[in-house]
Amino acid sequence: DLYLIAVSDRAVGEVAARLPIPDGAAVAHTAGSVPLAALPERFARRGVFYPMQTFTRGREVDFGEIPVFIEASSPALCDELEAFARRLSRTVIRSDSAQRAKVHLAAVFACNFANRMYALGERIARDAGLDFGVLKPLVTETAAKARDARSPLDVQTGPAVRGDRAVAERHEAMLDGDPRAREIYR
C-alpha cells in the first residue's frame, strides 16, 4: 500500500504524525519544499512524490506533462515510487530534499512571481481604462517563447534589452506614485 499525504507544506509533519497507517505501508508526501525527514521515522518506508505543477480545483491538467520528483528512504521504495510516477508522467526525476527545495524555489519564481507581474500589469492596464484581456495575447506569446527557447533570457524583449533608456525613464516616471512597482520595474 502507498499512502500519499497531499496537504499544505506546513501541515505535512502534523498530518503524518496523526495518520493511522499500518506498519509496512509506504507513506509519501507531495510537498516540494518539505524534506523527506519531515515524515516520522515510525514509517519505515518514507518517500516524496512531488508533482511540480500548480493545481486549481475544477481545472484539468495533463499529468503526463508534469515533472514528478521522487525521493525515498530506501532504493526499493524509490523504485516503487518511480514505477508509480511513470504511469502518470513522462518525466520522473530522482531528487534529494536539497535539490527539490531549490527546484521548488525555481517553480515559485517561474509561476507565482510571473503571475504577480501579470496582476501588476492588469492593475496598470485598468488604470489606463483597459481590461486585462488586452494583455492576454502578450502573456500567451511570452510564455510560449520562454517554453520553447533554450533559455528565457534568449527571448527577453523590451526597452532594457534594446538599451532604450528614454522609454525606460518614461515608464519609471509613470510609476512615481507606486514606489514598489517602480522598484520592480528597475
Label the model's feature ranges:
Residues 1-60:
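Rossmann-like NAD(P)(H) cofactor-binding subdomain of soluble oxidoreductases
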Residues 4-5, 70, 159:
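Glycine- and other small-residue-rich loops at beta-strand/loop junctions that grip anionic moieties
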Residues 12, 36, 78-81, 106, ...:
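A general structural signal for well-ordered alpha-helical segments in protein cores
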Residues 21-24, 129, 176-179:
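Short, glycine- and charge-enriched coil/turn segments that flank and shape catalytic ligand pockets
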Residues 30, 83, 183-186:
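Charge-dense polyanion-binding interfaces
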Residues 60-148:
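Internal alpha-helical scaffold of NAD(P)-dependent oxidoreductase catalytic cores
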Residues 142-186:
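Interdomain hinge/lid region at the active-site interface
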